[in-house]
Amino acid sequence: MAAICAMGMTPNEMRYFAKKHWKTLAEIDNGLIFKALATFIINKKVDKDGIKDGQLIADVIKEGMLLKGIRGFRDLPINLSICTVDTLTTDECIFTTYDEGLQNDHIHYLTDVPLEVAVRASMSFPAIYTTCDYGNYNFIDGGSKDNLPVKILKDMGVGKVLAIGFDIMAYNPDAGLDGLIKVIWRALDVYSIDGTRKSQKMADLAIEIKNENTQLFAIDSVDETIQEGYDAIMAHRDELLKIFGTQNDNA
């Protein structure tokens, strides 16, 4: 969503775009799982490192880029930074619009990377999407290392930072495939929880979205997620206006 927002899409365009592609990106076909298991049983090997082809993500982003006349990072109306993790070095990697001249231990800053590759890398959820190979890197979801990357923006000199994330304490174990995915996601939450809490304190304002009515990779939860996000923002409206100001007193 950060990428399509940076493309200059309006809220209605983002809603339409999300609803159009949600099923493509989120649906997990049980047949693919059984096929992978059958291949493993017969050949004693797994051909892919994910259930879904990560190229699907890149294709969706390229459609959005075509729609808004965007060729890459530097065509975006605003600067964009995207986080991912390299499985080979276990280092965090940050795609940026321009070279910010930053240096930090175990963080690689990358520029001139195709926008669709950067988004695919950042969304390559372990075991669900295939990893993203690019140059000497093998990328997976950035949330596996830093699920609320506030420090990155502070390092880049951003004056005030609003951190928005889902309420990670809202977790209910489940059974079946949905339960399996939730456990994997929960494990990532556990690994990154200390960093998330530090990021919340570092931000000028941190807002958590209560998402009791949504589930990871649920196909029909776009409208509910949008509403929950809207409710969370409006609940902090006064704080937002006080900290970040507004150009319109009626906003």
What are these model-derived regions, one by one?
Residues A3-A251:
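Patatin-like phospholipase
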